């Protein structure tokens, strides 16, 4: 059993209506009736029109509302309405995002996805509490986040078609071959990986990003860096010399990004390093259900195949919050505790998949992976990651934090020109670039 609603539709629907809100007081907005009609078409045609809209705070890409109403059957229901941020199409392929949301919901990994309208989408409300920064330091919650991250990284998803979600242990070889990127849930360290005794540097990376293999070039990190750098350079090309942006040497950070991608290609190009990732594991994208003892992820707009070290390293960066207080960056002890529980989760999912594969029962594989009663504590009795395994992934994740700093730095530059959300994107970008400079040598010298 899983907490999300059963999917009862063949695929996501689309309504050709555009919603424009100048403020968060939807009830007084002239588009209110349009939004009611969208809810009727996508969610419940017989819903009662006494609808409550509650703004969800904290978003820096989109505007979110929780909509509560009474269904035609007389029951209470809540959904999330997301209005796409102005200019966010520069970062996000909305068609791919809708397909990912549909496939994740169909497999029980995400909430029910009802469909899209011209500048937004609607999906189910996940019961629980949105995590706050301070929650990340609680051992039980950190373990649950690690468990859910491991479960995500065990999935195989064809994000370029409307095919069903595929588990990495599928016994059908033809199904395996249909996926866009082949991944592995192996927790062993590749012989080509960076050894803890090695101190790599970007200067030693000689591969050209243009010649990178298809698997690494298709990762979210590489695609985003290549695209966002070009967008940022174009947008800033006409800035006056006295502006704040003109003081950022984007050409240098572009070169840093090229060198970093070559470095990652050299050390982390094996398929064991690439999984289906959330890519935006910030506290407000995690819902904690205390009663069920679960943490579930929401908001999948940046999700896609990526380096596992990026997903983990980016999560560590998010301990610093939107104000980027890096004194809150997790200690080595906290990082390794998270990594240990992550490896346990990955191994547990892999073992379940292998056992069910032997029985040739694909449905049982899916149900087992989605079993909400699978707990970290019991898994520890079955598998104990080695210190070397934990340490190697610790180094890998910290190497990939460099990609996080650069990627979100360029994101901030673009958002400055396009977003209507009240947030200091330039200050955010400057701080991410500065942190890259500050930690680069230290991170690359990890042994």
From Swiss-Prot:
Entry's Gene Ontology cellular component terms: cytoplasm
Substrates-to-products reaction catalysed: ethanolamine + ATP = phosphoethanolamine + ADP + H(+)
Entry's Gene Ontology BP terms: phosphatidylethanolamine biosynthetic process
Catalytic class of the enzyme: transferase
Compartment(s): Cytoplasm
The protein's Enzyme Commission number: 2.7.1.82
Gene3D superfamilies associated with the record: 3.90.1200.10, Phosphorylase Kinase, domain 1
GO MF annotation list: ATP binding; ethanolamine kinase activity
Compositionally biased residues, Low complexity: 178-208
Chain intervals for the UniProt region annotation (Disordered): 178-217
Keywords, sorted A to Z: ATP-binding, Cytoplasm, Kinase, Lipid biosynthesis, Lipid metabolism, Nucleotide-binding, Phospholipid biosynthesis, Phospholipid metabolism, Transferase
Pathway note: Phospholipid metabolism; phosphatidylethanolamine biosynthesis; phosphatidylethanolamine from ethanolamine: step 1/3
Free-text function comment from the UniProt entry: Highly specific for ethanolamine phosphorylation. May be a rate-controlling step in phosphatidylethanolamine biosynthesis.
PANTHER family: CHOLINE/ETHANOALAMINE KINASE, ETHANOLAMINE KINASE
Family to which this protein belongs: Belongs to the choline/ethanolamine kinase family.
Protein name, entry field: Probable ethanolamine kinase B
Origin species: Dictyostelium discoideum (Social amoeba)
């Amino acid at each position: 059993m899983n907490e999300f609603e059963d999917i009862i539709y063949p695929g996501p629907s689309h309504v050709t209506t555009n919603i424009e809100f100048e403020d968060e007081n939807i009830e007084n907005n002239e588009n209110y009736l349009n939004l009611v009609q969208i809810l009727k078409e996508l969610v419940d045609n017989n819903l009662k029109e006494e609808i409550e809209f509650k703004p969800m705070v904290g978003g820096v890409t989109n505007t979110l509302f929780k909509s509560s109403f009474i269904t035609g059957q007389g029951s209470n229901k809540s959904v999330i309405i997301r209005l796409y941020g102005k200019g966010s199409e520069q970062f996000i392929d909305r068609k791919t995002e809708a397909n990912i949301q549909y496939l994740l919901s169909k497999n029980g990994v995400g909430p029910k996805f009802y469909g899209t309208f011209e500048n937004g989408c609607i999906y189910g409300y996940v019961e629980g509490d949105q995590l706050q920064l301070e929650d990340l330091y609680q051992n039980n919650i950190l373990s649950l986040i690690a468990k859910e991250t491991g479960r995500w990284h065990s999935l195989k998803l064809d994000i370029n078609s409307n095919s069903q979600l595929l588990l990495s242990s599928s016994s059908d070889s033809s199904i395996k071959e249909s996926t866009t990127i082949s991944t592995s849930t192996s927790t062993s360290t590749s012989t080509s990986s960076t050894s803890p005794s090695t101190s790599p540097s970007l200067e030693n990376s000689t591969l050209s990003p243009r010649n990178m293999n298809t698997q690494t070039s298709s990762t979210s990190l590489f695609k985003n860096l290549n695209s966002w750098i070009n967008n940022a350079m174009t947008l800033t090309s006409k800035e006056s010399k006295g502006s704040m942006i003109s003081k950022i040497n984007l050409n240098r950070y572009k070169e840093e990004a090229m060198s970093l991608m070559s470095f990652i290609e050299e050390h982390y190009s094996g398929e064991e390093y690439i999984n289906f990732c959330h890519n935006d594991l910030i506290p407000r994208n995690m819902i904690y259900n205390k009663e069920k003892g679960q943490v579930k992820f929401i908001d999948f707009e940046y999700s896609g195949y990526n380096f596992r070290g990026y997903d983990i390293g980016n999560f560590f960066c998010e301990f610093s919050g939107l104000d980027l207080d890096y004194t809150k960056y997790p200690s080595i002890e906290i990082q390794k505790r998270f990594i240990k529980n992550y490896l346990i989760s990955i191994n547990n999912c892999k073992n379940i998949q292998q056992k069910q594969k032997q029985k040739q029962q694909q449905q049982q594989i899916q149900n087992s992976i989605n079993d909400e009663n699978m707990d970290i504590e019991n898994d520890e009795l079955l598998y104990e990651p080695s210190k070397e395994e934990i340490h190697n992934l610790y180094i890998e994740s910290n190497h990939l934090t460099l990609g996080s700093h650069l990627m979100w730095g360029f994101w901030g530059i673009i958002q400055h020109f396009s977003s209507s959300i009240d947030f200091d994107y330039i200050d955010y970008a400057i701080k991410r670039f500065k942190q890259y400079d500050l930690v680069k040598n230290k991170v690359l010298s990890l042994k």
